[in-house]
């Protein structure tokens, strides 16, 4: 791998090859930002819709600063020291009692990504009318009604365009193991990211490589729980998956010194997740990976970088250093957060 110099970047004509300086334990922020800055639907929102919003809240100041940083990084290939953005992050985090982001301490890129998305969502959220129409004719419709009611309850007074990009609905079903006549109960909740466990042992013909699909199967497998005096079967399913799906691989144990470094086998394109969806039009959940956040180290410390896809080429961005990489190296034992975009969605 060779580093891309400023001259080479200028000649290539590829915008998006910009760097962020690490100004003191901010590699996790830089890694997260690079992944979000290469999220096409989020860029489209800022390019076409953000200008109609205005507010004096801390969250809006942060969102505006993110957009200013985004425009600068995409206007030309450059290296930026994001001091003002970091200062605003720390101010907002302190106001929200998120002390982990209010100082120059090493933090989790996955947690920061969700914090930033939630802040941007809060900065432009508004009340909207959400109507639920249609007839309930079968079991799938019963679940659909519960899902839509949950979505309405969560988002009717706090809606933003970011909901349509990052949010979908997860369903938890609970049923009595021994009373076969009892109908299952459903808990439906919106989500903006998924934390997938890494299974310990997966047996299959032809090898024991663990795949991303195996991680989804581990997450959605049946679980026996005791509620009161009764044993119940609990299962997590997805009514839908978002246009932009953010997956965190659960690599850290409660023991801070232990980290799962298992390589997860995963192709970069045409990832079919439809088997985990129980909602309507489930065949439409095919995804491509466009960015990843990598972590090297343990839970007590380490270093974050990002891999991003630009014009069908992959690059590793390590703070202020950019290297072109082979696509076979995008997913590896350091892969921590995976960003996927649904195929066929208008950008």
Q: What residues fall within each predicted segment?
A:
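UBL (ubiquitin/ubiquitin-like) substrate-recognition surfaces
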Residues: 1-347
């Amino acid at each position: 791998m060779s580093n891309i110099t400023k001259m080479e970047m200028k000649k290539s004509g590829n915008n998006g090859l910009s760097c962020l300086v690490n100004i003191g334990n901010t590699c996790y922020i830089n890694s997260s930002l690079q992944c979000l800055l290469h999220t096409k639907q989020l860029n489209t929102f800022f390019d076409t819709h953000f200008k109609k919003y205005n507010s004096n809240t801390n969250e809006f100041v942060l969102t505006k600063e993110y957009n200013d940083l985004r425009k600068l990084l995409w206007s030309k290939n450059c290296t930026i020291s994001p001091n003002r953005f970091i200062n605003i992050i720390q101010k907002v985090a302190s106001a929200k009692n998120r002390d982990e982001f209010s100082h120059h301490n090493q933090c989790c890129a996955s947690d920061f990504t969700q914090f930033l998305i939630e802040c941007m969502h809060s900065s432009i959220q508004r009340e909207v009318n959400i109507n639920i129409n249609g007839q309930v004719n079968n079991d799938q419709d019963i679940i659909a009604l519960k899902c839509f009611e949950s979505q309405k309850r969560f988002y009717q007074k706090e809606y933003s365009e970011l909901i349509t990009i990052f949010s979908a609905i997860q369903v938890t079903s609970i049923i009595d193991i021994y009373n076969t006549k009892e109908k299952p109960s459903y808990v439906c909740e919106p989500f903006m990211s998924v934390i997938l466990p890494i299974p310990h042992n997966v047996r299959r013909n032809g090898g024991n490589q663990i795949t991303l699909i195996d991680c989804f199967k581990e997450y959605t497998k049946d679980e026996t729980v005791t509620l009161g005096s009764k044993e119940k079967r609990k299962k997590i399913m997805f009514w839908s998956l978002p246009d932009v799906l953010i997956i965190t691989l659960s690599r850290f144990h409660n023991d801070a010194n232990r980290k799962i470094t298992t390589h997860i086998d995963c192709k970069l394109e045409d990832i079919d997740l439809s088997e985990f969806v129980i909602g309507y039009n489930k065949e439409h959940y095919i995804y491509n990976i466009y960015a990843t956040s990598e972590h090297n180290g343990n839970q007590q410390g380490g270093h974050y970088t990002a891999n991003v896809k630009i014009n069908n080429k992959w690059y590793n961005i390590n703070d202020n250093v950019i290297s072109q990489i082979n696509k076979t190296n995008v997913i590896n034992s350091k892969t921590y957060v995976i960003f996927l975009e649904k195929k066929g969605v208008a950008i």
